[in-house]
Curated annotation (Swiss-Prot):
Coiled-coil regions listed in the entry: none
Source species taxonomy: Eukaryota, Fungi, Dikarya, Ascomycota, Saccharomycotina
Residues bound to NADP(+): 65, 119, 146, 220, 224, 253, 255
Domain of life: Eukaryota
Protein name per the record: Very-long-chain 3-oxoacyl-CoA reductase
Length: 346
């Protein structure tokens, strides 16, 4: 039976005609949604102008709190927010690095700074008290939850050292939540006092490791996936208080954590990644199907959108590809470690 004969047979039956019409309407609907998603993606990435950070108090004497501020992406957030006219509270582990960075920012951008030495791996209440004391009375409108840790190399979950496991959970999850509980009330109070003439902003750094379940990075992957759900839930809670909450998803960025030194089209420098993030606040970019989430860097956005529209983030195929990739990375890392150990003996 040809396709024409099949369709003719269906249309001769009223029920079959309705089924065919229903299938056609579903197809048209899905195609329309896809076209709208692609259009929104391209407009977000390449058409809309940069977000005006005056919405969040830039050049109005307001403060931004940045965690993990002494290196990499966190340091770049500090530079770029200061360049936009925010005073900055720099939060990181090493006091000396923080003081050097604060002096550089004050000299270059003529803004005020404060530093808070904070070891996020310890979960010590003194840390949160020190942070709370530092921001008490300040008109804080922005929090950048940047502090984070991954595995030293890809590792099977059953072979993960207890300290590494505990540090990842404490830094990525516990510290992020407690820091937000410390800072968010100050942001909400500032917005309220300003009668919502400015808005508050909480950006939390996510990862493709949280977007896609990632074998051999199971603990890190789980911690970032947790942040994804938590951040979206928090966005719903704080919206009525004039505070925008957004999870920022990235693939690889040149940094100490990724161990990648050279930038490329798909792997931006911290400077380019942070610029894309700040320019695109409030837009989903590659995260077209996710609430209060953005994948801002254009190459990462296209990758995210492509995965969502094809294999899906939770598919067996995506999991298998991730497994094989990280097995290979682990094998190379172990081989390199063995070579360096042998050279050291010689």
């Amino acid at each position: 039976m040809s396709v024409v004969d099949f369709i003719q047979a269906i249309t001769e039956n009223k029920f079959g005609e309705y089924v065919l019409l229903g299938a056609l309407l579903v197809g048209v609907f899905k195609l329309t949604v896809f076209i709208l998603s692609v259009t929104s993606l391209l407009v977000d990435l390449f058409v809309l102008p940069a977000t005006n950070l005056k919405t969040y108090g830039a050049k109005k004497g307001k403060w931004a709190v940045i965690t993990g501020a002494s290196d990499g992406i966190g340091k770049e957030y500090a530079f770029q927010l200061a360049s936009k006219g925010f005073n900055v509270v720099l939060v990181s582990r090493t006091q000396a690095k923080l003081e050097t960075l604060a002096s550089e920012i004050e000299a270059k951008y003529k803004v005020e700074t404060k530093v808070v030495a904070f070891d996020a791996s310890t979960d010590a209440e003194d840390n949160y008290k020190s942070l709370g004391d530092a921001i008490s009375g300040l008109p804080v409108t922005v929090l950048i939850n940047n502090v984070g840790q991954s595995h030293s190399i890809p590792v099977p979950f059953l072979e993960t050292e207890n300290k590494e496991l505990q540090d990842i959970i404490t830094i990525n999850v516990t510290a992020t939540l407690k820091i937000t509980q410390t800072v968010a009330p100050v942001i909400a109070e500032t917005v309220s006092k300003e009668k919502k003439k400015v808005r508050g902003l909480i950006l939390t750094m996510g990862s493709f490791g949280g977007l896609l379940p990632t074998p051999y990075l199971a603990t890190y992957s789980g911690s970032k996936s947790f942040l994804q759900a938590w951040s979206a839930a928090l966005a719903g809670e704080l919206q009525s208080q004039g505070v925008d909450v957004e999870l920022v998803i990235s693939y690889l960025v040149t940094s100490a954590m990724s161990k990648i030194r050279r930038a490329s089209l798909s792997i931006p420098s911290p400077k380019n990644f942070v610029r894309a993030t700040l320019n695109g606040i409030g837009r989903r970019n590659g995260a077209q199907e996710r609430y209060a989430t953005s994948t801002p860097y254009w190459a990462h956005a296209l990758m995210h959108f492509g995965i969502d529209q094809t294999v899906g983030v939770y598919s067996k195929l995506a999991n298998s590809l991730n497994l094989n990739m990280h097995k290979s990375i682990r094998a190379r890392a172990l081989k390199k470690a063995a070579r360096l150990a042998a050279e050291k003996k010689d």
